[in-house]
Curated annotation (Swiss-Prot):
Biological process per Gene Ontology, one example term: regulation of DNA-templated transcription
Protein name per the record: Photoactive yellow protein
Domain of life the protein comes from: Bacteria
Residue list for modification S-(4-hydroxycinnamyl)cysteine: 69
Maturation and modification: The 4-hydroxycinnamic acid (p-coumaric acid) chromophore is covalently bound via a thioester linkage.
The keyword tRNA-binding is annotated on this UniProt entry: no
Gene: pyp
GO molecular function, one term: photoreceptor activity
Assembly with partners or alone: Monomer.
Length: 125
């Protein structure tokens, strides 16, 4: 399997070629969202970080239903700004704490290579 580095500049090129099984093999969380924040893909590593079953969150709104702790200017605000500008590419640290032990993570949000979707990458700090 191809090595994919968290935060790499061309990460969306590599992920565009991966199927669900390969996404599940990543060492960090990968969530693909539409422009409204609805979950299109949610890999196994993200499920391990949050304790959620990836199959149960597909189609739900990430910011409202799955991780309401991210419905903040620091997270959702950056997402909305990036979607509106068509140029989402930001990295920051955050603490996930909705229905889980507070967990400090590094987040990289980036527009997908094709289509109208966006990636949220997450790794424990």
């Amino acid at each position: 399997m191809e090595h994919v580095a968290f935060g790499s500049e061309d990460i969306e090129n590599t992920l565009a070629k991966m199927d669900d099984g390969q996404l599940d093999g990543l060492a960090f969380g990968a969530i693909q969202l539409d422009g409204d924040g609805n979950i299109l893909q949610y890999n196994a590593a993200e499920g391990d970080i949050t304790g959620r079953d990836p199959k149960q969150v597909i189609g739900k709104n990430f910011f409202k239903d799955v991780a309401p702790c991210t419905d903040s200017p620091e997270f959702y605000g950056k997402f909305k700004e990036g979607v509106a500008s068509g140029n989402l590419n930001t990295m920051f640290e955050y603490t996930f704490d909705y229905q889980m032990t507070p967990t400090k993570v590094k987040v990289h949000m980036k527009k997908a290579l094709s289509g109208d979707s966006y990636w949220v990458f997450v790794k424990r700090v």
